């Protein structure tokens, strides 16, 4: 079989010929790993099609080049593992954001203790500059080849493919099923690191074999790798799951409620502050507060399309022989609220806002702290308006998003997602909705990109992606335009002409999930939340028992003006109490000793360790008030102190 594969071996000749004739400098051509031709990414092994448009070279340090590099590194990882552990079966190994992984069926799961040996073998393969060879064979030949190697996972994949030629890639004595593209040889991987191990079910199905997944990353040079590893260490320090325990915010009990949050007192206070702020901001902007039930009959979910398109993510229960769905979204309830009476065009838009608890089934393997849960609260709003009001309403929502992102000091960018393969509604409605989103964004001169095919099943959407303090990207806000559900639920309004018309609906969530947003904020601020949001803003510490009465008096003064304050009058060493307050990331620490008692003042320290010095209680209250107000000025909003 090996000789049959050899005779189908394709070389890099055509790709290299193009590069040599392209007029590029020798140094530039060294970094080229492929090309973009007619919108397709092709490596140097793939025969060139008839060139009808511009051919764009892909360099190793470009986004496409980096993806090729990591995909190739995944093959090197698999080759190294097979060399060291010959009985291991290989499954899949794609590139992913910031790295790659490979899944193995091993006699025992891999552990980090295996990494040094695997990395050494990978480095040996890299040092030999082994070329990646592209091979095309028939489906029957591919089945025969992988069956002879007892690679059952590859056989299963091949059986699921349509008849025709199958593409393989080979480095040395290791051959893998793969479409490519890949870098020219193994020595293009200049820097890599194995990161972690995890369990992963074959094809993501919990009924299938549990595989051992090795996560890793690779970069074109060691400097980029070092920067990334430093960022990873910083991310570990900021991990919201770690900080959540340390700051008494939240916890999980996966044995009894997987993917559901238990809020501790500090976390519940922080969440309440955030939710109260959201309610006030929505009321100021013309929204009405509403709330719908948790359970709705299955017929409503069938009517909305959720039962057909989203059933696998929903929970159902039976009550008195009727099937009910636990809501995964709030839109159905909001449409029913709208329908309680007939609206005039003068009443539009109707803006409904709900901090709605929803449930969505996520597989246990993807649950991740607050960032991926099964029960969460959406800051969910639905705006029902006339088609001619649509653009202005979208602009107002984007403005709201901009204000909130400024408040939390997030940079952001906009992505518009278009119609997915699995969708409902007419072509005309989709075109109209997509056009409205694009026009609204362009009208306020904001840059955006298009993500084809990633819209909701009922309409296109705007996704707002933010960058946190250490450069990581998170998707937060979503704005969706929907002509379909108003039609399905027969929403109407009486127009200026006295006739009934169908409105359009905007689905939008700015934070998306309160739980997820708090998780992101925790990591963004490394647990040191801004003063206005911190559960405990001030901690009063006494030096001896003699200061206790005055400390209690200061405590009452601060409470009276709305400052969230704690009091520590324990008979402990002052240094210990200060350190404890700093670890709790309390913004202000007030020390009251004999001198402060005599002057009826407080000694002000910051959580950073800086000592501001002596202040009167009145001066300190003003300091805290200004600290709370400052972020809201940046966000273009007002802050009510108490």
Swiss-Prot record:
Domain of life: Bacteria
Cofactor binding note: Binds 1 zinc ion per subunit.
Chief site of localization: cytoplasm
Species per Swiss-Prot/TrEMBL record: Lawsonia intracellularis (strain PHE/MN1-00)
Protein name: Threonine--tRNA ligase
Organism ancestry: Bacteria, Pseudomonadati, Thermodesulfobacteriota, Desulfovibrionia, Desulfovibrionales
Cofactor(s) the record lists: Zn(2+)
Signal peptide: none
Molecular functions per Gene Ontology: ATP binding; metal ion binding; threonine-tRNA ligase activity; tRNA binding
CDD domains: ThrRS_anticodon, ThrRS_core
Gene name linked to the record: thrS
